[in-house]
Amino acid sequence: MAKRDQLTGKGPLSGNTRSHAMNHSKRRWNVNLQKATIKTENGSQRVLVSAKTLKTLKKHNLLA
């Protein structure tokens, strides 16, 4: 399963981790994915969304 928000498409970012000696190694910053049940025309559907999207859904009262 892809580490991607199913509603907004937000995915992981990549970059380098740096030590004090300025050594670097590649790493990924993954999205904080949460399971949520949202309201749809046909009832409700379970989706994987980021924590920020979940806050927005709660703000607009779109959770089932």
Swiss-Prot record:
Q: Which SUPFAM superfamilies match?
A: L28p-like
> GO biological process annotations for this chain's record?
translation
- InterPro entries found in the cross-reference section: Bacterial_rp_bL28, Ribosomal_bL28, Ribosomal_bL28/bL31-like_sf, Ribosomal_bL28_bact-type, Ribosomal_bL28_sf
| Keyword annotations of the record | Ribonucleoprotein, Ribosomal protein
One cellular component GO annotation, for this chain's record? ribonucleoprotein complex
Highest taxon of source: Bacteria
**Which Gene3D superfamilies does its entry note?**
Ribosomal protein L28/L24
Annotated region (Disordered) at 1-27
**Which residues fall in a coiled-coil region?**
none
Task: Give this protein's Gene Ontology molecular function annotations.
Answer: structural constituent of ribosome
* Protein family (similarity comment): Belongs to the bacterial ribosomal protein bL28 family.
Q: What protein does this entry describe?
A: Large ribosomal subunit protein bL28
Record the organism. Answer: Ureaplasma parvum serovar 3 (strain ATCC 700970)
Give the gene symbol.
rpmB
